[in-house]
Amino acid sequence: GPDMDVPAGDIGVGGREVGYMFGMYKKLTREFTGTFTGKGLEFGGSLIRPEATGFGGLYFVNQMLQAKGIDIKGKTVAISGFGNVAWGAATKATELGAKVITISGPDGYIYDPDGISGEKIDYMLELRSSGNDIVAPYVEQYPNATFVEGKRPWEVKADIALPCATQNELNGEDAQNLIKNDVLCVGEISNMGCTPEAIDLFIEHKTMYAPGKAVNAGGVATSGLEMSQNAMHLSWSAAEVDEKLHAIMHGIHAQCVKYGTEPDGYI
């Protein structure tokens, strides 16, 4: 019910589709409750909800690095996908001082040694909204970048790897490539982005690995914040929502450290 379930969008379901469902829900129940989340702002949606999963993922990854005394500034980041999650992750990574060097789609991946920031991140949204589901046109817009057809970005040397596309997108072979290239941290921002084989390899090699249930909680956390705003008939600013999201992700990381630290110090 409206106080228990948190329906929200995912691949192929955005604010428009949630809006359709919320409209029918209102018609059937004659109630305006915060049942559906990821709604448009005019229906009681929350600011930064579309990018919240990516934002929260970077807050968690940054906490992981800080716990090991590593500064995220200047680190290179390999991101897969080019939808809302990848867009949010690229935006926040850039804001924190990291350099995003890849995005990907079903057709292959983009490697941009100059970094994907500013207008390039905005162009990701243009690619997504085109409906073609391809990233190849990126190199026409930014010729210094390289498009690698039919492959995933995990063969690129990067300090941080962030699967942001779909399930099972990072397998054992990909994990071996990342480990060979001395990746510092892997954050599973997509749901079940890493195969069990890949996860086992990261743990075996003591690579910092953030499981999806922790690192991608920012999306559903912000859905909860959207429900809170609806219940109180309030609309918080983007900065307020972002601050609360940061606090939630900080708390989740603290719990992971508390209960996930092994005798040798590996978390």
Regions found by a protein language model. Give the residues of each.
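N-terminal ligand-binding/catalytic initiation module
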Residues: 1-47
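Flexible, glycine/charged-enriched surface loops at secondary-structure junctions
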Residues: 2-9, 32, 69-76, 256-267
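A short glycine/serine-rich beta->alpha loop
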Residues: 4-6, 42-49, 208-211, 262-266
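Active-site nucleophile and cofactor-binding loops and adjacent substrate-binding regions
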Residues: 10-11, 46-53, 78-82, 189-191, ...
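Glycine-rich beta-alpha junction loops
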Residues: 11-17, 105-110, 215-218
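Glycine-rich phosphate/diphosphate-binding loop of Rossmann-like nucleotide-binding domains
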Residues: 37-40, 45-157
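Adenosine-phosphate binding glycine-rich loop
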Residues: 64, 179-267
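Rossmann-like adenosine-cofactor binding region
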Residues: 108-209, 214
